[in-house]
Structure formats: C-alpha cells, structure tokens
Amino acid sequence: MHLTSREQEKLMLFLAGELAAKRKARGVKLNYPETVAYIASHLQEAARDGVSVAEVMQYGSTLLTVDDVMEGVAEMVHEVQIEATFPDGTKLVTVHNPIR
C-alpha cells in the first residue's frame, strides 16, 4: 500500500487523536499536542460523516473544556485549523477558541 504525504498526515493525526481520546477517557489531562490532535481528528471524522462546515466548526468548540486539559493549554490554543474532506470536496475548517 502506498500512501501520499497528505494521506500519511491524516493517518498520523487520526492516531494522535485516538491516543488523546484514550488518555482523556482515563481522566488524564491533555497536553497541547494531544489537545490539538483530539479536536482535529474529531473534526475530520465529522466532516467525513457528512456534517456541514458550519456544524463542524460549532462542534469543534464543544469537544473539550478547561477541565480536560493541562493548566495553561486552553490559553495556548487560539484556533484549530484543518483541511477536511466533505462529500462535496476539501474545505478549510477553522475553530476559534475551541476550549471553553
């Protein structure tokens, strides 16, 4: 199987997001890379499921709270931006201040 660079990046993002989800489920507070991966991977999956761009952006701000992340991480994550594959093509999705 040959994966393009873009496909490799998507796969790495998915794996990092899965690891972050497992840690969150165990009650471990997420660090910066885990936080971004968790949000980004959930956004990718929502887009792939056919959710609209606006709904994906709104969904991104409901995934984590300040209680889910390590101290200071919420202030560091001003936005999460991904290129997501929707049924009608690839689009840029930006979630501003995703941790509330």
Swiss-Prot record:
Keyword annotations: Cytoplasm, Hydrolase
Domain of life: Bacteria
EC number: 3.5.1.5
Alphabetized GO MF terms: nickel cation binding; urease activity
Places the protein is found: Cytoplasm
Metabolic or biological pathway: Nitrogen metabolism; urea degradation; CO(2) and NH(3) from urea (urease route): step 1/1
Reactions this protein catalyses: urea + 2 H2O + H(+) = hydrogencarbonate + 2 NH4(+)
An example Gene Ontology biological process: urea catabolic process
Pfam families: Urease_gamma
GO cellular component terms, semicolon-separated: cytoplasm
Keyword Hydrolase appears in the UniProt entry: yes
NCBIfam families per record: PRK13241.1, urease_gam
Complex formation: Heterotrimer of UreA (gamma), UreB (beta) and UreC (alpha) subunits. Three heterotrimers associate to form the active enzyme.
The family this protein is said to belong to: Belongs to the urease gamma subunit family.
Name this protein carries in UniProt: Urease subunit gamma
Organism: Haemophilus influenzae (strain PittGG)
